[in-house]
């Protein structure tokens, strides 16, 4: 398995059977600057979305049309994507699992909102925000928390799924901050590796992973703060 952080909450996940983009906010992502969208989207089979905000949906519509990748989203967001011309869509909702060739994705709770703002400035809700629990055939498992605060039922997610790797939002203001995210990882999860995300993109969120890394000191979990475009082989 190869994991590449594309900045913000966008990741590319490559396995022997799948090439996945998670929350592909790319063209307006300052952290993605210098990377090539065609390169990171080459050969993708699936696009996975945690919720409907623009900094997560990002380039999904264009990429889905260009690549033919299957898009996974909650039911309300899936309907919105369909109205934009995306025709290869799998939908689900909190607690549900969708199985693909080579991996499955389970929608978990997340404490956040999910919406798109239309041209007339009105915010339209697009279902609940979710985390995505990804189980791969003969590969490490990944829990992409999405945008969220800490919550005690994270313990149940860990009990049910035992994820090996966590994608953890740490930027504060719109999600939990680094210190709280570290507490969530240490109290509720048994990750082998925790990768911080959702930081450094906009001036109003934390610019570094320092608080998270400091909070993870002494943990059995490796806190791996990656640079945009950096890859990690598992």
Curated annotation (Swiss-Prot):
Keywords: Hydrolase. Transmembrane segments: none annotated. SMART domains: Lactamase_B (SM00849). It comes from the Bacteria. The keyword Hydrolase applies. InterPro entries: Metallo-B-lactamas, RibonucZ/Hydroxyglut_hydro, UPF0173, UPF0173_UPF0282_UlaG_hydrolase. CDD domains: metallo-hydrolase-like_MBL-fold. SUPFAM superfamilies: Metallo-hydrolase/oxidoreductase. Pfam families: Lactamase_B_2. The keyword Hydrolase applies. GO terms for molecular function: hydrolase activity. NCBIfam families: PRK00685.1 (NF001911). Belongs to the UPF0173 family. PANTHER family: UPF0173 METAL-DEPENDENT HYDROLASE MJ1163 (PTHR43546:SF3), UPF0173 METAL-DEPENDENT HYDROLASE MJ1163-RELATED (PTHR43546). This is UPF0173 metal-dependent hydrolase RHE_CH01853. The lineage of its organism: Bacteria, Pseudomonadati, Pseudomonadota, Alphaproteobacteria, Hyphomicrobiales.
């Amino acid at each position: 398995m190869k994991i590449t952080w594309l900045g913000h909450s966008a990741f590319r996940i490559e396995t022997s059977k799948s090439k996945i983009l998670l929350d592909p906010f790319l063209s307006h992502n300052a952290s993605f600057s210098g990377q090539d969208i065609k390169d990171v989207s080459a050969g993708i089979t699936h696009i996975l979305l945690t919720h409907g905000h623009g900094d997560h949906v990002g380039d999904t519509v264009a990429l889905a049309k260009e690549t033919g990748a299957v898009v996974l989203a909650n039911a309300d967001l899936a309907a919105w994507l369909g109205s934009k011309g995306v025709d290869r869509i799998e939908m689900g909702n909190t607690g549900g699992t969708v199985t693909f060739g080579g991996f499955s994705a389970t929608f978990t709770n997340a404490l956040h909102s999910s919406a798109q703002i239309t041209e007339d400035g009105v915010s339209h809700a697009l279902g609940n925000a979710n985390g995505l629990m990804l189980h791969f055939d003969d590969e490490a498992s990944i829990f992409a928390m999405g945008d969220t605060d800490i919550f005690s039922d994270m313990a149940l997610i860990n009990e049910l799924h035992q994820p090996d790797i966590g994608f953890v939002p740490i930027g504060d203001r719109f999600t939990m901050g680094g210190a709280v995210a570290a507490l969530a990882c240490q109290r509720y999860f048994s990750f082998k590796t925790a990768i911080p995300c959702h930081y450094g993109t906009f001036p109003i969120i934390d610019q570094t992973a320092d608080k998270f890394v400091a909070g993870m000191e002494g943990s059995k979990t490796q806190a791996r703060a990656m640079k945009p475009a950096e890859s990690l082989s598992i």
